């Protein structure tokens, strides 16, 4: 296994809250996959949920070395948790094609949040 990419991101949770108050669910619909959208709608802390997902997806796009552009979109990354709560990442659509081209075999995700910030790190390996 070799590290193909590393990305990290930090999000100010109040900025996400401000966007939601200005634009409603537009940001959430753009960022979240269908599965994540369903979770978001019933989550006890939807702003915090969205901020953490946003941070992971930004970190993942940085690990790819591209950022969000060239056909890559936030909702093509899907954050999930295993039975122990450990976060993982699925690639959908164009992100899945890019992962295959890069030879991604393993993905490591860590995320944390405190009062004001959510942060995430993503490592992709061959």
From Swiss-Prot:
Cofactor names: Mg(2+)
Binding site for Mg(2+): 9, 58
Function: Transfers the 4'-phosphopantetheine moiety from coenzyme A to a Ser of acyl-carrier-protein.
Gene name linked to the record: acpS
Organism whose genome encodes this protein: Erwinia tasmaniensis (strain DSM 17950 / CFBP 7177 / CIP 109463 / NCPPB 4357 / Et1/99)
Gene3D superfamilies listed in its UniProt record: 4'-phosphopantetheinyl transferase domain (3.90.470.20)
Enzyme class: transferase
Family affiliation: Belongs to the P-Pant transferase superfamily. AcpS family.
Reactions it catalyzes: apo-[ACP] + CoA = holo-[ACP] + adenosine 3',5'-bisphosphate + H(+)
Protein name: Holo-[acyl-carrier-protein] synthase
The enzyme's E.C. designation: 2.7.8.7
InterPro entries: 4-PPantetheinyl_Trfase_dom (IPR008278), 4-PPantetheinyl_Trfase_dom_sf (IPR037143), ACPS (IPR002582), Ppantetheine-prot_Trfase_dom (IPR004568)
GO biological process, one term: fatty acid biosynthetic process
UniProt keyword annotations, A-Z: Cytoplasm, Fatty acid biosynthesis, Fatty acid metabolism, Lipid biosynthesis, Lipid metabolism, Magnesium, Metal-binding, Transferase
Pfam families per the UniProt record, alphabetical: ACPS (PF01648)
Lipid metabolism among keywords: yes
Compartments (UniProt record): Cytoplasm
Keyword Cytoplasm (UniProt): yes
Molecular function via GO: holo-[acyl-carrier-protein] synthase activity; magnesium ion binding
Major place of residence: cytoplasm
CC annotations in GO: cytoplasm
Matching HAMAP family: AcpS
